[in-house]
């Protein structure tokens, strides 16, 4: 096992513990608490994968951080903070929408890279909006917290979330997963739109009809799907 992988996990465990103390003292806001909960799931998954105890890793992580802080001068810390870009937290969804439980009548789940996609295949002929909470750096999506698909009535019919046991994903991972989710929903004649906020930070542009710009590969896939559907409809007639 790579020593850097272990030390990274140990430091992450300790920093999570520090952030938990901030929340316990009621100093954290809603996005801070949301990230804390999701990072806890991620750490549990990483600990299981690495075969490491989280409590023991937290103690070692504390020692690593304390050693770094002893060697770090105040001036160096100021320079580091000044040169490091800060990420922003973007919220399409309210806390209620983010934390609401939901169930599927005809569940389908698919893993696309480090992301898990869930779709209710029972949903048909609906207008659906994709909304997400995520962090942004350099005006580009950095980390997806959670994406959900909502009907006009407010029902949740789909979701994309990071896999706790597979930390880290790229903007391309997110866009590919969104393509899969849209394809699954449109298969049942649903009309899917993507929030302007998500379009802006994931694709760098927005589409008037609410659809994200498609790659040539996605366009070919959608064309094949459309031809297949037309053939099925003709056979049914």
UniProtKB/Swiss-Prot annotation:
Localisation per UniProt entry: Host nucleus; Host cytoplasm
Region (PABPN1-binding): 223-230
InterPro entries, A to Z: NS1 (IPR004208), NS1A (IPR000256), NS1A_effect_dom-like_sf (IPR038064), uS15_NS1_RNA-bd_sf (IPR009068)
Domain of life: Viruses
UniProt short sequence motif Nuclear localization signal, positions renumbered to this chain: 34-38
Keyword annotations: Eukaryotic host gene expression shutoff by virus, Host cytoplasm, Host gene expression shutoff by virus, Host mRNA suppression by virus, Host nucleus, Host-virus interaction, Inhibition of host innate immune response by virus, Inhibition of host interferon signaling pathway by virus, Inhibition of host PKR by virus, Inhibition of host pre-mRNA processing by virus, Inhibition of host RIG-I by virus, Inhibition of host RLR pathway by virus, Interferon antiviral system evasion, RNA-binding, Ubl conjugation, Viral immunoevasion
Keyword RNA-binding applies: yes
One GO cellular component term noted in the UniProt record for this chain: host cell nucleus
Region (Disordered): 205-237
Coiled-coil regions listed: none
Changes after translation: Upon interferon induction, ISGylated via host HERC5; this results in the impairment of NS1 interaction with RNA targets due to its inability to form homodimers and to interact with host EIF2AK2/PKR.
Composition bias, Basic residues: 217-237
One Pfam entry name: Flu_NS1
GO molecular function, one term: RNA binding
Subunit and interaction comment: Homodimer. Interacts with host TRIM25 (via coiled coil); this interaction specifically inhibits TRIM25 multimerization and TRIM25-mediated RIGI CARD ubiquitination. Interacts with human EIF2AK2/PKR, CPSF4, IVNS1ABP and PABPN1.
Role played: Inhibits post-transcriptional processing of cellular pre-mRNA, by binding and inhibiting two cellular proteins that are required for the 3'-end processing of cellular pre-mRNAs: the 30 kDa cleavage and polyadenylation specificity factor/CPSF4 and the poly(A)-binding protein 2/PABPN1. In turn, unprocessed 3' end pre-mRNAs accumulate in the host nucleus and are no longer exported to the cytoplasm. Cellular protein synthesis is thereby shut off very early after virus infection.
Domain-level remarks: The dsRNA-binding region is required for suppression of RNA silencing.
Family that this chain belongs to: Belongs to the influenza A viruses NS1 family.
Name of the protein in question: Non-structural protein 1
Species of provenance: Influenza A virus (strain A/Port Chalmers/1/1973 H3N2)
């Amino acid at each position: 096992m790579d020593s850097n992988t272990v030390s990274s996990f140990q430091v992450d465990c300790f920093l999570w513990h520090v952030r938990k103390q901030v929340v316990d003292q009621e100093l954290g806001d809603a996005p801070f608490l949301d990230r804390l909960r999701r990072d806890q799931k991620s750490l549990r998954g990483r600990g299981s994968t690495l075969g490491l105890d989280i409590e023991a890793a937290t103690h070692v992580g504390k020692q690593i951080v304390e050693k770094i802080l002893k060697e770090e001068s105040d001036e160096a810390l100021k320079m580091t903070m000044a040169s490091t870009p800060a990420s922003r937290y973007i919220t399409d969804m309210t806390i209620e929408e983010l934390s609401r439980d939901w169930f599927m009548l005809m569940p389908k789940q698919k893993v696309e890279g480090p992301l898990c996609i869930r779709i209710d295949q029972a949903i048909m002929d609906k207008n659906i909006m994709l909304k997400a909470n995520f962090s942004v750096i350099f005006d580009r999506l950095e980390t997806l917290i959670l994406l959900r698909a909502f009907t006009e009535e407010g029902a949740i019919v789909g979701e994309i979330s990071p896999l706790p046991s597979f930390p880290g994903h790229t903007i391309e991972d997110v866009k590919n997963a969104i393509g899969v989710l849209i394809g699954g929903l449109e298969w049942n004649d649903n009309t899917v739109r993507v929030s302007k906020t998500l379009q802006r930070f994931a694709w760098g542009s927005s589409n008037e009809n609410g659809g994200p710009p498609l790659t040539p590969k996605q366009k070919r896939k959608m064309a094949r799907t459309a031809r297949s559907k037309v053939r099925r409809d003709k056979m049914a007639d």
